[in-house]
């Protein structure tokens, strides 16, 4: 079954083509990073308009990359939530029109479920074997930080989520405080690599399997102020002092966020007896997070390649395949659900 997946939940326009839920044929993505960088973050109205402009060209790129034509597509899948409501509406309406014109089945997909199934597209995963269920899934991005138990295809139980900022959002805010660019995750990681004496941050203590990053953000602001780095207009540190202080603060902040994510994930494994850990979402591209989980996980670790960690249409197509195989379909009344949950 050849599934075409469409992703427009935030600021990436993605169209992917996946055969049989496992074979990646195309993964075309139009990024809006440069558009939103001037604002220091994603502007919802701007994102929606950019999706309108990018969807048709991105669809054409995906079809060309896969070497297929639209009539060969067996089903159309689209992210219907969670996400920015305007961006979701653009994608959902485009998918409905496309499926209707082609006379093909339509399926709405949870964006977070898509991040889980990005791991099914990893070439190193044995195509003849399923990962061992249950899996503890850490889904960390700019909009979400959830710990979910996947007990089988389409079977999820929420173990914990962030009480305030998402991990990716925390990185974005930290980068802004330190005068770095957008998106913050790659910028923080790059600066952390230059650190000579990483600044220690307090350990995040939250009951259960929930997360919290607002305290770390406050600690960063105070330390940046003490170092004469923040607010930028009143910065008093010399250029050389600033560069060293920024790198050390970035390294300490990254260490604290990663440690919180790793500790809760491993605790989730201990509590549930899970047979594996799955990492998904934009933050899963962080090299330190991958390294720490690989070093400390007592069970197999499933991690998509970096290009599949960020938002894309291929992961939506992969997730849709397993639901379509069970006979699931949506009608033409499919709508956007910006607060949709998983588990």
Regions found by a protein language model. Give the residues of each.
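Short beta-strand scaffold segments in enzyme catalytic cores
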Residues: 13-18, 137-139, 145-149
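A contiguous, well-structured pocket-lining segment that forms one wall/lid of small-molecule binding clefts
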Residues: 69, 190-277, 286-295
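Glycine-rich beta-strand-to-loop/alpha-helix junction loops that act as flexible
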Residues: 78-81, 98, 141, 277-286
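Conserved phosphate-binding/catalytic loops in two-lobed NTP-binding clefts
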Residues: 108-109, 293-316
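Conserved phosphate-binding catalytic cores of ATP/NTP-utilizing and phosphoryl-transfer enzymes
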Residues: 109-135, 319
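Glycine-rich phosphate-binding/hydrolytic loop that grips phosphoryl groups
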Residues: 115-117, 305-342
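Glycine-rich phosphate-binding loop plus the immediately following alpha-helix
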Residues: 151-194, 218, 222-225
């Amino acid at each position: 079954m050849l599934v075409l997946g469409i992703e427009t939940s935030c600021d990436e326009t993605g169209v992917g083509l996946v055969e049989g839920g496992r074979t990646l044929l195309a993964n075309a993505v139009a990024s809006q990073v440069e558009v939103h960088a001037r604002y220091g973050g994603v502007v919802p109205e701007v994102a929606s308009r950019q999706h309108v402009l990018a969807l048709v060209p991105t669809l054409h790129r995906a079809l060309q990359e896969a070497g297929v034509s639209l009539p060969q597509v067996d089903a159309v899948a689209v992210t219907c939530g969670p996400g920015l409501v305007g961006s979701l509406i653009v994608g959902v309406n485009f998918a409905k029109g496309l499926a209707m014109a082609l006379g093909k089945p339509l399926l709405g997909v949870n964006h977070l479920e898509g991040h889980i199934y990005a791991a099914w597209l990893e070439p190193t995963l044995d195509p003849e074997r399923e990962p061992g269920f249950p899996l503890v899934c850490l889904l960390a991005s700019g909009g979400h930080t959830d710990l979910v138990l996947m007990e089988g295809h389409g079977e999820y139980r929420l173990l914990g989520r962030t009480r305030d900022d998402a991990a990716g959002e925390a990185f974005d805010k930290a980068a802004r405080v330190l005068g770095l660019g957008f998106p913050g995750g790659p910028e923080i990681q790059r600066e952390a690599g230059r650190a000579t004496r990483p600044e220690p941050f307090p350990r995040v203590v939250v009951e259960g399997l929930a997360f919290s990053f607002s305290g770390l953000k406050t600690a960063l602001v105070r330390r940046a102020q003490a170092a004469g780095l923040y607010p930028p207009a009143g910065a008093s540190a010399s250029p050389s002092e600033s560069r060293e202080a920024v790198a050390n603060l970035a390294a300490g902040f990254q260490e604290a966020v990663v440690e919180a994510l790793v500790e809760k994930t491993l605790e989730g494994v201990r509590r549930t007896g899970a047979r594996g850990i799955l990492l998904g979402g934009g933050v899963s591209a962080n090299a330190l997070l991958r390294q720490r989980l690989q070093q400390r996980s007592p069970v197999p670790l499933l991690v998509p390649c970096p290009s599949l960690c960020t938002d894309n249409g291929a992961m939506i197509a992969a997730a849709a395949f397993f639901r379509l195989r069970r006979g699931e379909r949506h009608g033409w009344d499919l709508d956007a659900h910006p607060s949709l949950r998983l588990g």
